[in-house]
Amino acid sequence: MAGSDTAPFLSQADDPDDGPAPGHPGLPGPMGNPKSGELEVPDCEGLQRITGLSRGHSTLIVVVLCYINLLNYMDRFTVAGVLTDIEQFFNIGDGSTGLIQTVFISSYMVLAPVFGYLGDRYNRKYLMCGGIAFWSLVTLGSSFIPREHFWLLLLTRGLVGVGEASYSTIAPTLIADLFVADQRSRMLSIFYFAIPVGSGLGYIAGSKVKDLAGDWHWALRVTPGLGVLAVLLLFLVVQEPPRGAVERHSGSPPLSPTSWWADLKALARNPSFVLSSLGFTAVAFVTGSLALWAPAFLLRSRVVLGETPPCLPGDSCSSSDSLIFGLITCLTGVLGVGLGVEISRRLRRFNPRADPLVCAAGLLGSSPFLFLSLACARGSIVATYIFIFIGETLLSMNWAIVADILLYVVIPTRRSTAEAFQIVLSHLLGDAGSPYLIGLISDRLRRSWPPSFLSEFRALQFSLMLCAFVGALGGAAFLGTAMFIENDRRRAQLHVQGLLHETEPSDDQIVVPQRGRSTRVPVSSVLI
């Protein structure tokens, strides 16, 4: 009798709602796969059967999503590439200039939960098509604003957030429903390569198109045409895969979405999600500040060093720093994302907490190099570029890993909502306010000193040093994530397999058949 009670009970629930059928593959940890803490990974043929898409088609979908991700970030940082020209055209200071990015991010942040809710319940392909089409039209319209209507530029940049919100909350969940395990990590790394590459191309396209056309307005007219192509590719190539099927190893029965309020409560009780989102907020704070202000800081540094003339009203400002910083952003992004994913993948074989630990190492390592890049700017622009290169490489190690953490600690029917609220948190406390905050501190410091090009440089230099401190705080948040990551991942796996039932917030239970009856026991007794 003892033997019957201690048999592999987790696959023998007699209530169909209590768990999977006997022989169900891929139970997590020692309960279903004693050699691994991972779900059993379907092969290519299994993935094709489950999703209804060939591997080639699934890969092509990821390529289309990467193209759109690249385009989104290219558009965002095209503005940064011509920032000095915008300041001169509208006759605004650093504080008002910082509002351009802040208004965009704030709109994006407000709309993200809306698209997160819709993305967990409705066709994701059509949501993205509508959002990107609207974004393309608004971006084109923003290039025709006269100099006396700066407020209208702020309004249009805010409306651009519709496209970003419709895409960024949904696209990673499509990848999660097409691939699992290491395949998913690789595809996410490809997807997130588009962030630094797109950002760098934004700087380059903004500065070069302005030089060729002789007018910065033309820099804002490049991405709308590419956006039309993106909508066509989405409509023709992307197909909607069933949510969570690749993790259940079956196209049915589908996971049922819960209420939005239940989703929020579950996410708030997920420490790995909360802490990794706080860590990612630090990444957003630093990257948002550098994205907008680094080219302007480098230009001011070279003016102080006597390497370039100052940018005066009516002059065409030098674009070489935007070009160089754009190239650095591209290279460091590709290198950092690739290094982060590969290091994490190798360490994961020996340490299941590798993902948050690699993220922590990246942030804690980047902070001193970013500080050195600012401290050396008065003496050597070459040293500044070298330290920026190292710091941004370490910072970029986080992008794909943070996305992977979210996807494996959150169940499929909550992932778009989780993406949305990670976006809200990271932008609310990160890059929504950081460009404006840096500009505001710079303005306050500059007013306390006699007017000069040196005071402009020093004010921005001291204000940007805040980024190094925030980066260190983010590293601490990822160290906290490492304490909870194993249990939270296993809970998500149990839920996907149908073994974990959320009844009350403090009483998550799994079904354990004993002597022909279903008995509920606290999940804490299993998650050791």
From Swiss-Prot:
Reactions performed catalytically: a 1-acyl-sn-glycero-3-phosphocholine(out) + H(+)(out) = a 1-acyl-sn-glycero-3-phosphocholine(in) + H(+)(in); 1-hexadecanoyl-sn-glycero-3-phosphocholine(out) + H(+)(out) = 1-hexadecanoyl-sn-glycero-3-phosphocholine(in) + H(+)(in); 1-(9Z-octadecenoyl)-sn-glycero-3-phosphocholine(out) + H(+)(out) = 1-(9Z-octadecenoyl)-sn-glycero-3-phosphocholine(in) + H(+)(in); 1-(5Z,8Z,11Z,14Z-eicosatetraenoyl)-sn-glycero-3-phosphocholine(out) + H(+)(out) = 1-(5Z,8Z,11Z,14Z-eicosatetraenoyl)-sn-glycero-3-phosphocholine(in) + H(+)(in)
Any one GO CC term of the record: lysosomal membrane
Full protein name: Protein spinster homolog 1
Species this protein is from: Rattus norvegicus (Rat)
Oligomer and partners: Interacts with BCL2 and BCL2L1.
Transmembrane segments: 60-80, 98-118, 126-146, 160-180, 187-207, 218-238, 278-298, 323-343, 357-377, 381-401, 421-441, 465-485
Stated role: Plays a critical role in the phospholipid salvage pathway from lysosomes to the cytosol. Mediates the rate-limiting, proton-dependent, lysosomal efflux of lysophospholipids, which can then be reacylated by acyltransferases in the endoplasmic reticulum to form phospholipids. Selective for zwitterionic headgroups such as lysophosphatidylcholine (LPC) and lysophosphatidylethanolamine (LPE), can also transport lysophosphatidylglycerol (LPG), but not other anionic lysophospholipids, sphingosine, nor sphingomyelin.
Single biological process term from Gene Ontology: lysophospholipid transport
Residues modified to Phosphoserine: 518
Family recorded in the similarity comment: Belongs to the major facilitator superfamily. Spinster (TC 2.A.1.49) family.
SUPFAM superfamilies recorded: MFS general substrate transporter
PANTHER family the record matches: PROTEIN SPINSTER HOMOLOG 1 (PTHR23505:SF13), SPINSTER (PTHR23505)
N-acetylalanine carried by residues: 2
Domain of life: Eukaryota
InterPro entries xrefs: MFS, MFS_dom, MFS_spinster-like, MFS_trans_sf
Molecular function terms, GO-annotated: transmembrane transporter activity
Alphabetic keyword roster: Acetylation, Lipid transport, Lysosome, Membrane, Phosphoprotein, Transmembrane, Transmembrane helix, Transport
Compartment(s): Lysosome membrane
Membrane topology: Multi-pass membrane protein
Annotated region (Disordered), positions in chain: 1-38
Family matches, as Pfam families: MFS_1 (PF07690)
